[in-house]
């Protein structure tokens, strides 16, 4: 059996910001590797450095010092344009607020990342988008617009959009933050399914409960890793969903 390769590797990453005369040390030497097929939560309270780390992982920013490798590629010395290209090919983002274009269909939203990929024709884009929407259980809503869907359905569109480019890693930022309890567990069922299919997932959250459904948890405090543990007792989101009280009809 071949050893899995690190998709993400941080080596002593520091990120400092100058605010007036003060230096804010948002990340104070963060090192870890995330391997192919892992489902990792990154947790931390406000001020822990979680958002700064998310920007590093998403190639939205570069370290003050240290190294960041995404799928074996060094990010630190890249220009903004190079990082944008790498980000589009290697990372699938899922945001708390869905970030869907209004007045466009599910398929059109999911096609967006492929617009910048010259390897795809218009027909191939459409086929890939339909496949991704089927994968997240929205095969019946391909041509629905955002205002015709629930929050959970819109988040499924966002997850399909994240998957369409076959990224090295899916990076979810508080992806259940705007959803009710039942819909949140439906999303966790989907993330666990994607994990079982071999997708690498990083789920940034302030909710410690989500760590119980992931394979590993990294906890930040004051810009440093406080804890990095493997979860040997992964709970089933499907079982948790089934145990919830049935929704009452109005």
Set out the residue ranges of the language-model regions.
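Conserved beta-strand-loop-alpha-helix hinge in the C-terminal portion
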Residues: 224-249
């Amino acid at each position: 059996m071949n050893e899995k390769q690190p998709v993400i590797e941080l080596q002593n990453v520091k990120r400092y910001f100058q605010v007036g005369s003060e230096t804010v040390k948002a990340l104070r030497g963060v090192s870890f590797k995330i391997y192919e097929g892992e489902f990792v939560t990154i947790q931390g309270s406000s001020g822990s450095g979680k958002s700064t780390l998310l920007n590093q992982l998403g190639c939205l920013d570069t370290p003050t010092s240290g190294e960041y490798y995404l799928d074996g590629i060094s990010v630190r010395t890249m220009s903004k344009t190079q990082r944008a290209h790498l980000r589009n090919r290697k990372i699938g983002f899922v945001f708390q607020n869905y970030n869907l274009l209004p007045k466009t269909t599910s398929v059109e939203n999911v096609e967006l990342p492929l617009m910048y990929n010259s390897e795809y024709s218009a027909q191939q884009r459409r086929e890939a988008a339909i496949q991704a929407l089927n994968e997240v259980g929205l095969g019946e809503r391909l041509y629905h617009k955002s205002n015709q869907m629930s929050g959970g359905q819109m988040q499924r569109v966002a997850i399909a959009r994240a998957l369409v480019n076959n990224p090295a890693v899916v990076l979810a930022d508080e992806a259940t933050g705007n959803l009710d309890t039942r819909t949140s567990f439906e999303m966790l069922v989907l993330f666990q399914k994607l994990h079982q299919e071999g997708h690498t997932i990083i789920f940034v959250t302030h909710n410690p409960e989500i760590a119980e459904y992931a394979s590993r948890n990294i906890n930040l405090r004051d810009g440093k890793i406080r804890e990095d543990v493997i979860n040997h007792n992964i709970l089933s989101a499907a079982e948790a969903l089934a145990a919830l009280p049935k929704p009452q009809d109005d």
